[in-house]
Amino acid sequence: NRAAPKVQGALLEAMQEHRVTIGKETFSLPAPFLVIATQNPVEQAGTFELPEAQLDRFMLCHRLQYPTRDQECEVLRRNMDLGVARQEQGAIARTEFDMIDQQAVGSHEDLVEAMEQVHQVHVSETFLEHVVELVNRTRQHPAIELGASPRAGISLIKASRARALIHGRDYVIPEDLYALAEDVILHRIRLNYEALADGRRGAEVLQEMLSGMGAITGTS
């Protein structure tokens, strides 16, 4: 959200059309094409709010919390000096984080293969109907001004299949939907003025909708 609106418009074209336009020329982006972005929800000075159309094109929006005590200790350990990297104009202290981009964890072929495996994960008709029900509930809830678009359902199915594969399954289960609903849905909905005035939060409203759906059964 620190990018200017013109830059955000260019990114929207890349995310939606998988291409970029420079002047009168248009260039197709290589595949697979992924966008990972960070946003500071607290510091708003010098930022530009992302339009709903652009937020909707992010499959997931994961909200980070403060690290635990053990995690923070590990961060400090990894950030300790690992020597000095000499450059033409001097030198800088190196940390383990500086070496992340030098440690490849997979290849282009590995990513394509994983994408193919995700598409083979089975989604039952019952699961699909529950996804549609949840998305529709966001459009009918009295506290929500802007409900989720059909892209939310598409993203929830994709994310559920990926989660199933990560957990060693070739089919989705209800736990996938409940585990991913917040990351897939929250950034796509907007509470109305009355709900905000009452101090309600999107996560609370979403939990109400999930609780009201009852048990999800059937994986075949």
Predicted regions span which residues?
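Short conserved motifs of the RecA-like P-loop NTPase core
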Residues: 108-115, 128-130, 134-140
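C-terminal engagement/docking regions of AAA+ P-loop ATPases
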Residues: 132, 137-220
